[in-house]
């Protein structure tokens, strides 16, 4: 499925949104979902892009590993989180390049234009140059 992407258009945008500014939000984690919800009542078209079709609530992952919480309780579909918004389109895939001077991103090999870009791709763990620590200290955000 490399290179494939799926359009989960929640509802067709209203006519007034067809020419509204286009906001692209890359990342469906805490920051991306918050940005999306903050723009709910704005006259903008929002495209939310993530590699996964769900938001993972990482603070409860340890409870999944101990059996106190089921996997489904920590992974909420993006559609469920932003599905009530009429100005959102969710795309699944990966942004591989950003061209701020041309206001373009490359998503699954194709260029897309935007008016505003929100990069909310999250963070990763660092081992301060000691990758051998990764074996003994698996990251859990």
Where are these regions (language model features)?
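Beta1-alpha1 glycine-rich phosphate/pyrophosphate-binding loop at the start
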Residues: 10-89, 132-133
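FAD-binding core/adjacent interface of flavoenzyme oxidoreductases
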Residues: 1-20, 88-141
């Amino acid at each position: 499925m490399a290179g494939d992407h799926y359009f989960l258009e929640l509802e067709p945008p209203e006519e007034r949104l067809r020419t509204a500014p286009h906001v692209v939000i890359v990342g469906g984690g805490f920051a991306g979902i918050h940005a999306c919800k903050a723009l709910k009542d704005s006259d903008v078209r929002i495209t939310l892009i993530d590699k996964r079709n769900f938001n993972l609530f990482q603070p409860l992952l340890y409870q999944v590993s101990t059996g106190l919480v089921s996997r489904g309780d920590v992974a909420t579909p993006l559609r469920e989180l932003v599905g009530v918004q009429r100005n959102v389109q969710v795309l699944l895939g990966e942004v591989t390049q950003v061209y701020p001077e041309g206001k373009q991103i490359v998503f699954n090999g194709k260029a897309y234009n935007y008016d505003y870009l929100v990069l909310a791709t999250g963070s990763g763990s660092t081992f301060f140059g000691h990758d051998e620590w990764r074996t003994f200290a698996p990251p859990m955000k």
